Amino acid sequence: MVKRKHLLGLQELSKEEINTILDIARPMRDIIMRDIKKVPTLRGKTVATLFYEPSTRTRSSFELAAKFLSADTLSINVSSSSVQKGESLIDTIRTLEAMGVEIIAVRHQQSGVPKFISLNTKMSVINAGDGFHEHPTQALLDLFTIKQKLYKIEGLKVAIIGDIYHSRVARSNIWGLLKLGAEVTVCGPPSLIPVEIEKLGVRVEINLQRTLEWADVVNVLRIQKERQDAGYLTTLDEYRDWYGLTQEKLEKLKGKKLLILHPGPLNRGVEIDDYVADSPNAVVNEQVTNGVAVRMAVLYLLAGGNESGNVD
């Protein structure tokens, strides 16, 4: 990772590179827990966020990560920028480059846009989510959270539940989990499971209760209403009955402990109920905190930081 200029996806990272990011995220999290959440590591650097899709968590997380490292930040509001006047993506990138931006986090509705930008700029590019392709920093924060809570990833049984077909979060998690030695099962309606996904090395299960009995960790994906409108689901109520993580389904496990993750935002009453979302086993808010730490680690490494993680 130290030698990489960009973070475009977990598919291209080695196990060692992933572990380097997770290791450096630990001291970054310590910084976040302090009263004074600031170190001078990236003073003089400029980090921009360019999001062509709505985002609260990811965008704010990148901006806070940069500020905690003392970088200057620039947030491009696409809805009120020159993009609305017809400015091309390349011209937008060249403008930011000319302004002195060194690192840019990009989210786009089309897969491959961060890669395209990386081939046409001197800036370091971070993929903040591209189409159905990847969302690497979300997967990294999920991995970090699992390791923080269970002290390991190798040998764990991790289930990803929900709309696998449209989920960049699922894809990045699959790459990362498999590289770190976890077993992975995907579970959801057959209409939302990609054909031949088993070729990646994952198991496919359509019965949620069997999946919960198998798993040590479950990552519950958000279900979007537009999937129902497009015919992938009959009703959200039916989805909740079959695949929603509920108190009733957990009680059938007879006290078995499950670590429960969710990338947010939660659709309470659809993919997860209030009882589960607010239970001690759910670590959604810790994921948010860890997301800032992981993104600090990524910014630090892309800016040329060493693997010791010594930032003070």
Curated annotation (Swiss-Prot):
Annotated EC: 2.1.3.2
Binding annotation for L-aspartate: 85, 168, 222
Catalytic activity annotation: carbamoyl phosphate + L-aspartate = N-carbamoyl-L-aspartate + phosphate + H(+)
GO molecular function, one term: amino acid binding
Pfam (any one): OTCace
Positions that bind carbamoyl phosphate: 57-58, 107, 135, 138, 264-265
Keyword field: Pyrimidine biosynthesis, Transferase
SUPFAM superfamilies in UniProt: Aspartate/ornithine carbamoyltransferase
GO CC terms in record: cytosol
Keyword Nucleotidyltransferase among record annotations: no
Domain of life: Bacteria
PROSITE patterns given in the database record: CARBAMOYLTRANSFERASE (PS00097)
Pathway of action: Pyrimidine metabolism; UMP biosynthesis via de novo pathway; (S)-dihydroorotate from bicarbonate: step 2/3
GO biological process, one term: 'de novo' pyrimidine nucleobase biosynthetic process
Top-rank EC class of the record's enzyme: transferase
PANTHER family: ASPARTATE CARBAMOYLTRANSFERASE (PTHR45753:SF6), ORNITHINE CARBAMOYLTRANSFERASE, MITOCHONDRIAL (PTHR45753)
Assigned protein family: Belongs to the aspartate/ornithine carbamoyltransferase superfamily. ATCase family.
Subunit and partners: Heterododecamer (2C3:3R2) of six catalytic PyrB chains organized as two trimers (C3), and six regulatory PyrI chains organized as three dimers (R2).
Protein name: Aspartate carbamoyltransferase catalytic subunit
Organism from which the protein derives: Carboxydothermus hydrogenoformans (strain ATCC BAA-161 / DSM 6008 / Z-2901)
Designated gene of the protein: pyrB
